[in-house]
Amino acid sequence: MVKNEPLTEDGERGVIIMVSSSAATDGQPGQVAYSASKGAVASLTLPLARDLARHGIRAVTIAPALFDSAMTKLMPKKVKASLERVMEFPVRPGKPEEFASLALQVVENSMLNGSVLRLDGAMRMPSRM
């Protein structure tokens, strides 16, 4: 990306979009490694944005909660149902196109930089299910 020609009048050369998870801040019992790895991605966001700013490269992380995905298809129905019960609004898993819509907004909006964007319908995972 550093070698890219600037794409905008501000000199932007691109954006790195990373994916974390609501588990970075709301990890469940048994998710120590998963939560730690997603927390590491979230923690990387601001320092990476600062390091790459001089090159005109942005860094943003999207932290989704429960979304329809290959991973959630593997969840037992009971677990998925209990997670859906703690969704505030909308009361359903996120849709892939909703994730894509946010990713597109990140690409298009140069002021989004160095941020972790929760995409979670106000869901906060309980400490126990």
Language-model regions, residue ranges each:
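Active-site helix of classical SDR
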Residues: 37
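Residue(s) in the substrate-gating loop at a strand-loop-helix junction
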Residues: 21
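Active-site loop immediately N-terminal to the catalytic Tyr-X3-Lys motif
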Residues: 26-32, 91
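A short helix-coil junction within the Rossmann-fold of NAD(P)-dependent oxidoreductases
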Residues: 1-12
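C-terminal substrate-recognition "lid" of short-chain dehydrogenase/reductases
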Residues: 95-119, 124
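Short, flexible catalytic-loop segment of classical short-chain dehydrogenase/reductase
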Residues: 25, 59, 63-74
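Alpha-helical segment proximal to the catalytic Tyr-Lys
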Residues: 49-54
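Catalytic Tyr-x(3-8)-Lys segment
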Residues: 78-98
